[in-house]
Amino acid sequence: MRTGLIAKKLGMTRLFKEDGTHVPVTVLHVDNLQVVDVRTQDRDGYTAVQLGFGNAKVKNVSKPNRGHFARVKVEPKKKLAEFRVADDAVLEAGATLSAAHFVVGQKVDVTSTSKGKGFAGAMKRWNFAGLEASHGVSISHRSHGSTGNRQDPGKTFKNKKMAGHLGSERVTTLNLEVAAVDAEKNLLMVRGSVPGGKNELVLVRDAIKKARHAEAPYPAALVAAAG
């Protein structure tokens, strides 16, 4: 099991194939992604690597994190994320990862925060059918109807599907195909849509339900080794 990557969603575009057909893709940018820390079985009870994305201004970083970055001699980072890895896929702190970590044709899982839609009704939020257009129904056409039955149980249970805040949730899209990789510009192009809006940070990892691509570099594709 390899580490994943942290990337920024730049937006969507399309790629043209040799036969003239086009493929919609989401462009992800891997910006100065470095290994910040390593979790070990002996010390932490599990094996993982902590990655840091982009460079942050020192004034925007808390004092504990400043010391954390200084200890491994890396610039302060905007975003930190951990990825569980196998014992033989551990990377040294300070190593810089490349978008070439993934290869064309490989399947990946992408995790991010979905776009916030604000307060939404039951029809939009949960795909409810709503009430009838006529036959005695007035004003309540888009309502969700009864929520508590009658005297028994006489209450609305927790987690009942009702109107409320839609979006702004952690969402993972599975088995997206890598359509193109630009190692020089550190760009990753994934077929289809990815959760979140423009400039949202996303986590990209090998698809958990598919075997790892035979040509994918193991344990990782590095721009520069530690130190």
Curated annotation (Swiss-Prot):
Classification via InterPro entries: Ribosomal_uL3, Ribosomal_uL3_bac/org-type, Ribosomal_uL3_CS, Transl_B-barrel_sf
UniProt xrefs under Gene3D superfamilies: 3.30.160.810, Translation factors
Gene Ontology CC: cytosolic large ribosomal subunit
GO biological process, one term: translation
Keywords: Methylation, Ribonucleoprotein, Ribosomal protein, RNA-binding, rRNA-binding
Oligomeric and partner information: Part of the 50S ribosomal subunit. Forms a cluster with proteins L14 and L19.
Family named by the database record: Belongs to the universal ribosomal protein uL3 family.
Function: One of the primary rRNA binding proteins, it binds directly near the 3'-end of the 23S rRNA, where it nucleates assembly of the 50S subunit.
Protein name per Swiss-Prot or TrEMBL: Large ribosomal subunit protein uL3
